[in-house]
């Protein structure tokens, strides 16, 4: 074979090897998620999406409800307006819930902005939070992701980003016994309240948490829906005042406070520092590691001490009016830490209660009777979290 022919064969073989190597390298880039130059031109800065605490599913009389928060931080140099948020099944992208328009506005909060603000725009370098609740039906996803559509000013136009994968937490622990006797009690809570427990972050110890994510405030009423039998400004005239507060399970006492004074009048209750908001309280450590909190207890009524072992139904103290309170009630919540301000709120179920009805309008608390439960619907509820502003009765 002539020398020229040998050189031509080697050259052709080198070209083939370069072509194969180029294709192989391109495959590696694609597999690694590294954009080729043409794709890089379409990339754009937008939101950093985060779910800081796992989405939690909890059973109510309306079925399985999921509670979560989506944090959106704007890393661009221009304001981004959130126009739509979707929760999707991470396995196949099936849309599980979607929020837009006024519904999205009601769920959105810009950190540091006035509570009444309705705009869903996140300025550069700021963080917004979308408080999300959605109903499960037949599908029980193992994990979810989020798709956020947004509008940017000028030529940037509209875009969307998908991310914030999170594993759904289905465990709610062993159902608990009643924290109070009898009733009727209004189970006061509502996810949509902009300054309600469900939306209040406490940022201590370097972390932002929502201790009251699933908190319930229990207010005693009579058959006519009244909260008092005399002077509404006198704490002692409220129906629930002094009611025995009960251990919801066999547990160990983790923390107590019993020395805070109580305002002589409802209207005269002063503002309190964050560490004093709970008033007098008892925290018990459940055997599954969760902590149950009983807050705003009557001064001098706490009947247990730290380290003491208590049993379900045992009296821990009395309902009172200490701390940040607008009237005598029992604040009850469950969290993952023995601190009133530095724990993440966790879902809980009561093993049994009677559902008498509900208040559609919280403005009617103390003014009128609740809307009674439909006679055809089951009154006895088991292994459930009380629905928003439900009126319940526990066993005597």
Question: What do the predicted segments below correspond to?
Answer:
Residues 250-298:
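Zn2+-dependent peptidoglycan hydrolase active-site motif and core
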Residues 72-79:
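Asparagine-centered strand-capping/turn motif at beta-strand->loop junctions
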Residues 97-139:
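Intrinsically disordered, low-complexity Pro/Gly/Ser/Thr-rich segments with frequent PxxP/GP/PP motifs
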Residues 290-313:
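Short histidine-centered loop motifs in beta-beta connectors
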Residues 197-247, 256-275, 396:
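Short glycine/threonine/proline-enriched tight-turn/helix- or strand-capping micro-motif at secondary-structure
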Residues 170-189, 196-200, 206, 229, ...:
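Acidic, glycine-rich catalytic/binding loops that coordinate metals and/or anionic ligands
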Residues 251-253, 307-319:
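A structural signal for short beta-strand/turn segments enriched in small hydrophobics and glycine
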Residues 52-53, 62-69:
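Short, solvent-exposed loop/turn segments enriched in Ser/Thr/Gly
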């Amino acid at each position: 074979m002539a020398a020229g022919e040998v050189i031509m064969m080697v050259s052709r073989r080198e070209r083939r090897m370069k072509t194969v190597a180029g294709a192989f390298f391109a495959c590696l880039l694609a597999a690694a998620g590294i954009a080729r130059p043409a794709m890089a031109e379409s990339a754009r800065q937008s939101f950093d999406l985060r779910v800081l605490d796992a989405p939690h599913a909890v059973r109510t009389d309306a079925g399985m409800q999921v509670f979560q928060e989506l944090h959106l931080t704007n890393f661009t140099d221009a304001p981004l307006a959130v126009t739509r948020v979707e929760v999707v099944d991470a396995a196949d992208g099936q849309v599980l819930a979607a929020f837009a328009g006024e519904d999205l506005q009601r769920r959105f909060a810009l950190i540091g902005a006035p509570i009444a603000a309705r705009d869903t725009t996140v300025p550069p370098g700021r963080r917004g939070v979308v408080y999300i609740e959605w109903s499960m039906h037949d599908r029980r996803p193992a994990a979810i992701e989020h798709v956020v559509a947004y509008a940017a000013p000028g030529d940037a136009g509209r875009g969307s980003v998908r991310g914030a994968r999170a594993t759904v937490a289905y465990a709610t622990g062993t159902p608990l016994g009643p924290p109070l006797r009898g009733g009727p009690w209004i189970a006061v809570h509502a996810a949509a309240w902009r300054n309600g427990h469900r939306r209040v972050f406490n940022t201590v110890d370097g972390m932002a948490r929502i201790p009251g994510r699933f908190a319930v405030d229990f207010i005693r009423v009579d058959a006519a829906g009244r909260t008092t039998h005399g002077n509404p400004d006198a704490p002692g005239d409220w129906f629930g005042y002094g009611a025995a507060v009960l251990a919801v399970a066999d547990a160990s006492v983790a923390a107590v406070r019993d020395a805070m004074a109580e305002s002589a009048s409802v209207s005269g209750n002063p503002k309190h520092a964050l560490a004093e908001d709970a008033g007098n309280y008892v925290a018990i450590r459940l055997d599954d590691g969760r902590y149950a909190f009983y807050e705003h207890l009557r001064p001098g009524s706490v009947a247990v001490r730290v380290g003491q072992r208590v049993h379900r139904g045992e009296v821990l103290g009395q309902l009172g009016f200490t701390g940040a309170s607008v009237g005598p009630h029992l604040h009850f919540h469950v969290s993952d830490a023995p601190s009133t301000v530095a724990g993440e709120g966790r879902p809980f179920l009561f093993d049994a209660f009677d559902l008498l009805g509900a208040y559609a309008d919280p403005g009617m608390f103390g003014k009128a009777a609740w809307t009674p439960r439909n006679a055809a619907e089951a009154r006895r509820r088991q292994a459930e979290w009380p629905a928003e502003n439900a009126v319940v009765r526990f066993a005597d």
